[in-house]
């Protein structure tokens, strides 16, 4: 999905950075490819401060950043739980969120449809919330599901 989304943005004149799971960078050829694409690794098993700082810097510089709110790939028609990282980064940098729905193809890179929603900003969380960015993360997922629903796709929200 990251490669498909990168290509869709790249072909429209953008060169986004990508935050990807560290496992993708273990193979030297894959590491070269993803680094060339502007990707950088995140260790999903812990609070990876290096990756978070890099992502915040990318956004503060006005660059686009591809990040999947679930933190992993999710099977078609299923839903992963939204992690709060994407929402936290958007709020802290004042960056807009561009929701994207990718309809998978039957074969690699064939039949995939990338649909962009309208950019939106997340509100700052209220003080004292247990998980201050959870509402924002859920809002991002709702926007993505709305795009899927508008395309007639089966989404976790109908």
How would you describe each model-predicted region?
Residues 1-46, 54:
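Catalytic core of membrane glycerolipid acyltransferases/transacylases, capturing the structured
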């Amino acid at each position: 999905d990251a490669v498909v989304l990168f290509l869709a943005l790249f072909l429209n004149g953008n060169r986004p950075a990508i935050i990807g799971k560290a496992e993708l960078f273990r193979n030297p050829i894959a590491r070269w490819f993803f680094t060339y694409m502007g990707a950088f690794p995140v260790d999903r098993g812990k609070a990876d401060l290096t990756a978070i700082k890099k992502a915040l810097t990318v956004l503060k510089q006005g660059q686009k950043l591809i990040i999947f709110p679930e933190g992993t790939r999710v099977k078609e028609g299923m839903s992963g739980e939204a992690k709060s990282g994407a929402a936290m980064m958007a709020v802290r940098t004042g960056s807009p969120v561009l929701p994207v729905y990718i309809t998978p193809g039957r074969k690699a890179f064939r039949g995939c449809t990338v649909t962009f929603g309208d950019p939106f900003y997340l509100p700052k969380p209220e003080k004292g919330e247990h998980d201050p960015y959870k509402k924002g993360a859920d809002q991002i997922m709702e926007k993505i599901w709305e795009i899927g629903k508008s395309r007639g796709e089966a989404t976790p929200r109908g």
